[in-house]
């Protein structure tokens, strides 16, 4: 298997990546925001989406014009398919069908399921632990736990940038700085940008969300080892300000209980 630095260099340059790879995202749209310019460079890609994209709270669904969580989830799945077509990406796909915003209570199960599908993968790429979204953090934890279970057989862990809080504001498509894990940014071609712009537009139900991101920005790095019993590296959690019942302190307690 190529070294982590070599993989990062290939991601930055847009070179083909032949190593069997698993990308774990929390929701339909995360793959496009975080890795959309590079998904078509993987020749052996398994895309795993942890949630169905539909919270039990109907606020998001109703705001997008849907009368049920089921209809909203189906619409988001269709949007993801259209986005992948726009990106010229042809991964194998699995959805674990966890309820959106509920991954914290399924960390252990997610890790166990990942062990089964990581056995033949050389690389795994997911969200960082940065307090941007509770499902993102749960994905980061599940991957770290799964790789710990696999030991010497574990794939190389990488991350794509999502969003976090710094100085009281949301910072998107950039990592919280970690000197031990410097980030790289891709050289995006005109075709890359055109495909990703079309993929952004495929997520019609998520137009408000997508407006916080730019198609021309991505960043990747080797994943550090996180201590999930402590607050994420930025300290403050962005999702504490979303008005949701789940707060970051509760997240750590429930994630630890779920992980066993």
Task: Enumerate the language-model features and the residues they cover.
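Active-site beta-strand->loop->alpha-helix modules in alpha/beta enzyme cores, enriched
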Residues: 1-159, 198, 202, 216-218, ...
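C-terminal and late-domain segments of enzyme folds
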Residues: 207-260
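Bulky hydrophobic/aromatic packing residues
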Residues: 18, 128, 140, 163-168, ...
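Short, flexible loop segments at boundaries between secondary-structure elements
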Residues: 151-177
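A conserved mid-domain beta-alpha-beta active-site/ligand-binding segment of alpha/beta enzyme cores
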Residues: 167-229
């Amino acid at each position: 298997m190529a070294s982590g630095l070599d993989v990062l260099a290939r991601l930055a340059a847009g070179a083909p990546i032949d190593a069997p790879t698993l990308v774990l995202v929390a929701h339909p749209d995360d793959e496009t925001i975080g890795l959309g310019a590079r998904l078509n460079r993987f020749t052996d890609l398994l895309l795993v989406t942890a949630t169905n994209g539909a919270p039990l709270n109907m606020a998001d669904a109703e705001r997008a014009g849907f009368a049920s969580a089921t209809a909203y989830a189906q619409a988001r799945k269709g949007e993801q398919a259209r986005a992948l077509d726009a990106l010229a990406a042809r991964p194998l796909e699995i959805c674990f069908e966890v309820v959106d915003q509920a991954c914290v209570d399924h960390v252990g199960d997610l890790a166990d399921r990942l062990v089964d599908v990581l056995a033949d993968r050389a690389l795994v790429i997911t969200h960082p632990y940065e307090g941007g979204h509770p499902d993102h953090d749960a994905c980061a934890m599940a991957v770290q736990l799964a790789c710990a279970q696999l030991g010497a057989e574990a794939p190389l862990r990488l991350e794509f940038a999502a969003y976090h809080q710094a100085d009281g504001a949301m910072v998107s498509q950039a990592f919280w700085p970690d000197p031990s894990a410097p980030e790289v940014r891709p050289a995006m071609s005109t075709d890359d940008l055109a495909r990703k712009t079309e993929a952004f537009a495929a997520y019609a139900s998520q137009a408000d969300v997508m407006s916080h991101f730019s198609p021309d920005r991505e960043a990747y790095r080797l994943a550090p080892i996180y201590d999930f019993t402590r607050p994420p590296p930025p300290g403050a959690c962005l999702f504490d300000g979303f008005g949701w019942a789940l707060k970051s302190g509760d997240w750590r307690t429930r994630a630890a209980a779920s992980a066993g």
